[in-house]
């Protein structure tokens, strides 16, 4: 999102779970600037205000070691749009059952994104792999998904969500330009090095099964996955069948969930 705004000539203040905190930068934020903020469930759970534009890419079990149950986790996510007004915009994932169920609570303009179906308003991926935006004014074909530099169908979904969120603020031409140039973020399928014919990738931000599976589907080659870390008390059932080769473990979660041949 920040790259799109920067390409459009806007001054952007970026804050998220990794990197510099945004609050100390508040004195530098002018009314015409844009703040792009990634918010965790820990921050959302106590929020009583919502942003002008809210994008929820998907919801899957996570951080259940910190939340009393899955419903509390989902309710925290809902605060992203619960306090919006009629002039706000909310973008939800049509393909995710949990985010689809949030639609009835949205107060502002609702937009969808989907890689599986044509939506009535928002963005979608057609059967030829072309990204589209559709609304009351018509259906605009944007660019083939092969133009997206970073790998993985989950990144196609991310671009669909972002385009729906920024439509009207960024030109269609810039969407394609940034898609070709954006190389991704640290720790998310980040290429580290190639050694003895083996390419090493850092996907350590994939700290739940849904994100890990998305990373696995980003590659056509055979993989060796080293997984583990802190156990967040979430179900791992879906991950086992997806790991079809070797697996190694490290950290608290390694032994109980170590995959076998």
Segments the model singles out, each with a brief description of its role:
Residues 1-94, 98-108:
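Phosphate-binding loop of NTP-binding sites
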Residues 90-94, 226-227, 245-257:
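Short internal beta-strands
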Residues 124-143, 185-193:
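Acidic-glycine-rich active-site phosphate/pyrophosphate-binding loop
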Residues 96-101, 118-121, 233-235, 256-260:
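Short, charged/polar "capping" segments at the starts of alpha-helices
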Residues 145-247:
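Nucleotide phosphate-binding/pyrophosphate-handling subdomain across enzymes
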Residues 17, 115, 228-230, 253-255:
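Cofactor-binding loop segments of dinucleotide-utilizing enzymes, especially the Rossmann-like FAD-
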Residues 2, 162-163, 257, 261:
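A generic structural signal for short, well-ordered alpha-helical segments in conserved domains
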Residues 13-15, 107-126, 176-180, 190:
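Beta-strand->loop->alpha-helix junctions that form or flank phosphate-binding loops
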